[in-house]
Structure formats: structure tokens, C-alpha cells
């Protein structure tokens, strides 16, 4: 498939799981002789939620919760059919969201 590029976006709450998954994908792509660019770390999405601790009074007492979504980007340049087959067979952890664009 000359001239094609596969763009893989990974998202997870745990950055260690994300880095392990990215490493697996890069290793598989390199084993099938495809050119790999990445993993490129993208900005982390950070959401902050503030909740009152008491349902009735004590407005000054609040609890803060934070959610971070870590992201990585991997480009596989000039993939072949072996690369695509190998990528389909990879087992990734349940906490990692994978989005693939051709």
C-alpha cells in the first residue's frame, strides 16, 4: 500500500498502560518493516470537579476531584498487509482506547 499512512490515537487514564500499549504497537510495526513515527505525547486533558461535602451547609468545605486523560499518537508510514494483520492481533489492556484512521 504505497503512499498510505495509518494514524493511531491512544487514550487512557493511566499513563503507564498507555506507554506499554504504544510500545507494543511500535514493536509490531517495526517487525513488519514499516516506518514508524512516534509515539508522540499529546497534551493531557485535565478536568476538575468541585463538590460540596455537606448537602445542607458549610459551603466553604468542598471536595475536589480530578480526571486526567493521557494521549499518544503513532503514525505508521507505508504499511503493508502484514502490518495490518499484526496490528489486528495485538491484545491491549482494557483501559486503553484505540482510534485508527487510514
UniProtKB/Swiss-Prot annotation:
GO terms for cellular component: ribonucleoprotein complex; ribosome. Pfam families: Ribosomal_S10 (PF00338). One of its GO terms (biological process) is translation. InterPro entries: Ribosomal_uS10, Ribosomal_uS10_CS, Ribosomal_uS10_dom, Ribosomal_uS10_dom_sf. The keyword RNA-binding does not apply. One of its GO terms (molecular function) is structural constituent of ribosome. Keywords: Ribonucleoprotein, Ribosomal protein. The keyword Ribonucleoprotein applies. Belongs to the universal ribosomal protein uS10 family. Involved in the binding of tRNA to the ribosomes. Part of the 30S ribosomal subunit. HAMAP family: Ribosomal_uS10 (MF_00508). This is Small ribosomal subunit protein uS10. The gene is rpsJ.
